[in-house]
């Protein structure tokens, strides 16, 4: 698969041959769904907790005698049916993460890359180095490229000026190539890869 390389100003800068085994697969929605679910579950803090009937600070004394009042039978006021009582079957602190094989995770990333290539929302740029960290200038360059909602993947390290200029732009995410992931690829309309990122990905999946 051949794709044109652009500069940040929208001009042409040659072309690159993309590996069909990485960028030319038929996307499988089931793999992408499993991977996104795994990512979102793994990043949950799991610190949610409520007080059950043994935790609330209320008297354990029986409300009134068992028989003879005509009222329903009740024990302590900490029971869930009372205002101020404990929560029944509420959330507890736990780990939400679950297992997903490493080979499935790697395959899902290739399918995510292929989905962008198939939808023609994959752009390859020669480099993302800029002279200063002015956000206004970068917005103008993105306008020339037609970028308003994009994930931009740099090389092993993202240019400092580019990272600073881009972080103030809404709906623009910037990551080094080792941080590329399925969720961030799918949540943005366009995927922008540098030539260095393409080389690193092809080396990774060799």
Swiss-Prot record:
InterPro entries: Ribosomal_uL4, Ribosomal_uL4-like, Ribosomal_uL4_dom_sf
Keyword hit for Zinc: no
Function summary: One of the primary rRNA binding proteins, this protein initially binds near the 5'-end of the 23S rRNA. It is important during the early stages of 50S assembly. It makes multiple contacts with different domains of the 23S rRNA in the assembled 50S subunit and ribosome. Forms part of the polypeptide exit tunnel.
Keywords: Ribonucleoprotein, Ribosomal protein, RNA-binding, rRNA-binding
GO cellular component: ribonucleoprotein complex; ribosome
Subunit description: Part of the 50S ribosomal subunit.
Protein family according to the UniProt entry: Belongs to the universal ribosomal protein uL4 family.
Protein name: Large ribosomal subunit protein uL4
GO MF annotation terms: rRNA binding; structural constituent of ribosome
């Amino acid at each position: 698969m051949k794709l044109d390389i652009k500069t940040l100003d929208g001009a042409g800068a040659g072309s690159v041959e993309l590996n069909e085994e990485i960028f030319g697969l038929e996307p499988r929605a089931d793999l992408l769904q499993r991977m996104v679910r795994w990512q979102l579950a793994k990043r949950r803090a799991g610190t949610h907790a409520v007080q059950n009937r043994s935790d609330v600070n209320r008297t354990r004394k029986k409300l009134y005698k068992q028989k003879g009042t005509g009222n329903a039978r009740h024990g302590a006021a900490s029971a869930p049916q009372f205002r101020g009582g404990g929560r029944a079957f509420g959330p507890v602190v736990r780990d939400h993460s679950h297992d997903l094989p490493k080979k499935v995770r790697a395959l899902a990333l290739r399918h995510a890359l292929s989905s962008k290539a198939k939808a023609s929302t994959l752009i390859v740029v020669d480099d993302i180095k800029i002279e200063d960290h002015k956000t206004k200038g970068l917005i103008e360059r993105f306008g020339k490229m037609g970028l308003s909602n994009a994930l931009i993947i740099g090389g092993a390290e993202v240019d400092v000026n580019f990272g600073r200029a881009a972080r103030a732009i809404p709906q623009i995410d910037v990551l080094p190539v080792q941080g590329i992931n399925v969720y961030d690829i799918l949540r943005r309309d366009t995927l922008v890869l540098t030539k260095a990122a393409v080389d690193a990905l092809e080396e990774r999946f060799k």
